[in-house]
Amino acid sequence: MANTASARKRIRQNERRRERNVARMSRMRTFIKKVELAIQAGDKSAAAEAFKVAQPEMQRAAGKGVIAKNTISRKLSRLSARVKALATA
């Protein structure tokens, strides 16, 4: 248990930040899921549109430090490749 006022404050701050980060991760995952569902359905235009909306959301999560920038780069690259493959198929 925290003994000092500053330690109690850090606990409160950490909890607020954790809740914010959980919300950001959930939002990002939702956008990714929309792209993946469009890809599975084979809908080229919906997949491209969903990717266009998901990309800034994913980059925002990386910018806020919720997830590592290289991880987001990798996820975006793979998702983009799948959308492009769908467009050419």
From Swiss-Prot:
The organism's taxonomic lineage, starting at the top: Bacteria, Pseudomonadati, Pseudomonadota, Alphaproteobacteria, Acetobacterales
Query: HAMAP family, from UniProt?
Result: Ribosomal_bS20
Indicate yes or no for the key word Ribosomal protein.
Answer: yes
Q: What cystine pairs are annotated?
A: none
Q: Where are the transmembrane segments?
A: none
Q: What does this protein do?
A: Binds directly to 16S ribosomal RNA.
A single GO BP: translation
* Keyword RNA-binding in annotation: yes
* Residue ranges with Basic and acidic residues bias: 12-22
Residues of the region (Disordered) are: 1-22
Q: Which family does it belong to?
A: Belongs to the bacterial ribosomal protein bS20 family.
| Protein keywords | Ribonucleoprotein, Ribosomal protein, RNA-binding, rRNA-binding
**Which InterPro entries does the record associate with it?**
Ribosomal_bS20 (IPR002583), Ribosomal_bS20_sf (IPR036510)
Q: What is this protein called?
A: Small ribosomal subunit protein bS20
Q: Which GO terms describe its molecular function?
A: small ribosomal subunit rRNA binding; structural constituent of ribosome
One of this protein's Pfam families, by short name?
Ribosomal_S20p
SUPFAM superfamilies per the record?
Ribosomal protein S20
Q: Which GO terms describe its cellular component?
A: small ribosomal subunit
Protein's gene: rpsT
